[in-house]
A protein has these predicted regions:
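Conserved lysine of the Walker
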Residues: 13
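Pre-Walker A (Motif I) flank of P-loop NTPase domains
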Residues: 1-2
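Conserved substrate/cofactor phosphate-moiety recognition/catalytic segment
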Residues: 18-63
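Glycine-rich phosphate-binding loop used to anchor ATP phosphates in small-molecule kinases
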Residues: 52-107
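Hydrophobic anchor at the beta1->P-loop junction of P-loop NTPases
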Residues: 5
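A glycine- and Lys/Arg-enriched "phosphate-lid" helix/loop adjacent to the NTP-binding pocket
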Residues: 89-162, 166
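The conserved Walker
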Residues: 9
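Short loop/turn segments at strand-loop or loop-helix junctions that form parts
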Residues: 32-34, 75-78, 115-119
């Protein structure tokens, strides 16, 4: 079964994936594609729009590619990239992703969604956005999208250890 972490940037999704992998090497983890795409942007001079378009398309591909893996945790989903596209004002990209979400069958798949709220200060890792207001806006829009798509989520809070315990209770 796929397990998907959704949340704004800097909420601990990647950290949680790494901690789960340390506890159980049989777990497959997949981080989002934003980091390598940002590196490619810096090398190629992609515009922000081009960067987001590539992130959106790769996220769709990853979603389909990881469909048949058992015991997998994803740090990003099509829902996240739809929200980022919308927050960045790239309405056509957001609308395209919304259409894909509605028509791809994604909403009918057997997936555990875990929502990670903002609980920690943003860390500057050289790739992630460090704008706290942007982080809050993305979080607000994610919560709206969860309602819009009627996605059942388990909210994870507390330390990494606390969150892992909460995950284990759902498995």
């Amino acid at each position: 079964m796929r397990n998907v972490f959704i949340g704004s940037h800097g909420t601990g999704k990647t950290t949680l994936c790494k901690a789960l992998k340390k506890l159980d090497s049989s777990i497959a983890i997949r981080d989002g594609v934003s980091r390598p795409v940002k590196i490619a942007r810096d090398k190629t001079g992609m515009t922000p729009y081009q960067e987001q378009a590539v992130i959106n398309e790769l996220t769709k591909f990853y979603w389909e590619y990881n469909k048949d893996f058992d015991n997998i945790f994803l740090a990003r989903s099509p829902l996240d990239v739809e929200v980022y596209s919308r927050v960045f004002g790239m309405v056509d990209l957001a609308d395209d992703m919304e259409n894909w979400i509605r028509t791809s069958g994604m909403l009918n798949e057997d997936v555990n969604y875990f929502y990670l709220p903002i609980e920690f200060e943003l860390e500057d890792d050289g790739v992630r956005f460090v704008d706290v207001e942007l982080q809050k806006k993305v979080d607000e829009e994610l919560q709206k999208s969860i309602k819009k798509y009627n996605i059942k989520v388990t909210k994870l809070t507390g330390s990494v250890e606390d969150r892992i315990k909460q995950i284990h209770r759902t498995q």
